[in-house]
């Protein structure tokens, strides 16, 4: 059979929008929309740094992106989930892995 039509969907976290940027300069608006698309592309059940290949919840993204994201989205549910992921992966000695919820040990 021949494929007659194909539709792609952009999936991301359903966080409510709490802020927006718009100005009289079209270039600034385009830059804002590009950055917002990148943030939404990396904001699912975990925060990633490159949605086309990275699927692990590297926790530094939660720290590095929080200020940028909180002015645009309500992150309360996402960050509650991230904190729960951190708690559930915490080791007996108190160490929190750099990846949560899936703990990966890289050998090499």
Where are the regions that the model predicts?
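Substrate-binding groove/exosite segments of carbohydrate-active enzymes
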Residues: 2-108
């Amino acid at each position: 059979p021949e494929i007659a039509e194909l539709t792609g969907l952009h999936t991301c976290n359903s966080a409510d929008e709490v802020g927006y940027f718009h100005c009289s300069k079209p270039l600034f608006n385009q830059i804002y929309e590009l950055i917002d698309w990148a943030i939404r592309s990396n904001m699912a059940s975990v925060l990633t740094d490159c949605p086309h290949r990275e699927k692990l919840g590297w926790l530094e993204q939660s720290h590095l992106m929080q200020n940028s994201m909180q002015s645009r989205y309500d992150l309360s549910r996402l960050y509650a989930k991230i904190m729960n992921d951190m708690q559930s992966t915490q080791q007996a000695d108190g160490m929190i892995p750099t990846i949560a919820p899936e703990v990966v040990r890289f050998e090499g």
